[in-house]
Regions:
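Hydrophobic beta-strand core residues of beta-sandwich domains
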Residues: 28, 68-70, 84, 97
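C-terminal interaction-tip segments
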Residues: 1-34, 38, 44, 95-117
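Solvent-exposed serine/threonine-rich low-complexity stretches and specific carbohydrate-binding patches
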Residues: 10-13, 62-70
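Solvent-exposed, conformationally flexible loop/turn segments
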Residues: 14-21, 69-75, 87
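Short, surface-exposed beta-strand/strand-loop-strand elements in extracellular ectodomains
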Residues: 46-63
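Exposed aromatic-hydrophobic patches
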Residues: 23-26, 74-81
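Noncatalytic modules at the cell exterior or secretory-pathway interfaces
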Residues: 81-98
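Short aromatic-acidic-glycine turn motif
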Residues: 60-64, 114-117
Length: 117
């Protein structure tokens, strides 16, 4: 019995058109779970805005991490790994932006089957 580990990398970008936006990751496919090891985020335009991370899926949004104030430098967001179940997503809620702000969020981790192969 061995476990197949599939690297997970996702990049979300946004050019703000107003003060608030939500970015959503791809959902975890059926039969798998996803471990997020790192989230880094930057407002590449200016040091302004805030971000909250929510776990979404199955009709709910669960607040995951405390509010972070954005800067132009890359900021690490996680203090420990985060595990998502089938069909769950992460939602990045951005507030306090100005139209034209360029936001970039990078996720790294891995997917693995719920049942060993």
């Amino acid at each position: 019995v061995f476990v197949v580990i599939i690297p997970y990398r996702e990049r979300l970008t946004l050019t703000a058109t107003g003060p608030s936006h939500i970015l959503t990751t791809s959902s975890v496919r059926c039969g798998y779970k996803r471990t997020i090891e790192r989230i880094i985020i930057a407002n590449k335009t200016a040091a302004r805005g805030t971000v909250d991370i929510y776990l979404g899926g199955y009709g709910y949004n669960h607040y995951v991490y405390p509010t972070l104030t954005l800067s132009q430098a890359w900021q690490h967001f996680l203090t420990s790994d985060l595990t998502l179940r089938e069909e769950e997503t992460l939602e990045i809620a951005l507030n306090g932006l100005t139209a034209g702000d360029e936001i970039e969020v990078l996720f790294t981790g891995y997917d693995e089957p719920l049942m060993p192969v």
